[in-house]
Amino acid sequence: MIVLGSTGSIGVNTLFIAKEKNISIEALSCGKNIKLLNEQIALFKPKFVCIQDEKDKHLVDHKNIFCAQDGLKKMISECKSKFVVNAIVGFAGLNSSLIAQKLGKTLALANKESLVVAGKFFDTSKIKAIDSEHAALKCLIDKRKDIKKLFITASGGAFYKYKIKDLKNVSVKEALKHPNWSMGAKITIDSASMCNKLFEIIEAYHLYGIKQIDAVIEKKSLVHALCEFKDGGISAYFSHANMRLSIAQAILDEHDQSFIENLDLLAMPSLKFEKISLKKYPIFMLKDELLKNPDLGVVINAANEYLVYKFLKNQMGFLDISKGIFKALDHFGVPKINQIEDVFEYDKRVRLYLDKEMK
């Protein structure tokens, strides 16, 4: 298979499972972590590799090196593998998802932004979501037609215990302390702002075609999703917070090997479900509007991505993320997305607008 974003958290865990199950790796891609990429090259001996910056080419221990977005497209096209794991972070992963589907490859998707910004351009029946919530939903839905509502859970992120007034001056270091999951910087900030949960809701809509979706806080991250049925019953999916489970479910057809420990029900702490506070997590206010107009995902994602990286560089405060998103939405409204080129155009326009407005 092809693993894009191989040096990130999802990529590393995907390769762990690939090694365990003797899955051959035809191609790897990464951003800047050339040291880890070289270790992966030595272990998996891929036919091709792709890196972000051509300037780093001399550092890579490989002969067949592609570079940047154009290189990624060429590499995926040259690969014979029919299975692509896309674990690239952010909007940068969209092109790879599009080319993989165009070539008829099965897409194991950790890059949720592909669906957030361009869900209507994908055949989601050929996508396997690498996400604990969506893997849980798939298991719970299981061909049932009598679904009333879906729920995914949120931990509350790094600032669950913080008072609203204290969020104004939080540091990047504080924001990156996720209570339950070990993830990359971008998604950890998205978890703290609840933008991640907003994205997972629209992702679930594109994957399963159900608009009756909500999220609740379950701060232990032991319940990942719930499915409410018309007969009055509710099913819930429990597991430890470990991405290896949903990766294995996406990349292996059938397996009986355990990649994580089962929960010990008798040792499990008491669980509590809570409503998401819109005062503390104002971004989540956009849920119903986004489900009504999924094309808003292009504006929200571009704004969020731009603002999160500004925050990570200490160039703005944490609360500026939500403020900037609402500012962009006020300016652009519901975008007219008729073709995939419109997605790229709006993404560019939103970033340019915020670059001017948020100085």
UniProtKB/Swiss-Prot annotation:
EC number: 1.1.1.267
Catalytic activity: 2-C-methyl-D-erythritol 4-phosphate + NADP(+) = 1-deoxy-D-xylulose 5-phosphate + NADPH + H(+)
Keywords: Isoprene biosynthesis, Manganese, Metal-binding, NADP, Oxidoreductase
InterPro entries per the UniProt record, alphabetical: DXP_reductoisomerase (IPR003821), DXP_reductoisomerase_C (IPR013644), DXP_reductoisomerase_N (IPR013512), DXPR_C (IPR026877), DXPR_C_sf (IPR036169), NAD(P)-bd_dom_sf (IPR036291)
Gene Ontology molecular function: 1-deoxy-D-xylulose-5-phosphate reductoisomerase activity; manganese ion binding; NADPH binding
Glycosyltransferase as UniProt keyword: no
Residues that coordinate or bind Mn(2+): 131, 133, 200
Family annotation (SUPFAM superfamilies): 1-deoxy-D-xylulose-5-phosphate reductoisomerase, C-terminal domain, Glyceraldehyde-3-phosphate dehydrogenase-like, C-terminal domain, NAD(P)-binding Rossmann-fold domains
NCBIfam families from the UniProt entry: Dxr (TIGR00243)
Protein name: 1-deoxy-D-xylulose 5-phosphate reductoisomerase
Source organism: Campylobacter lari (strain RM2100 / D67 / ATCC BAA-1060)
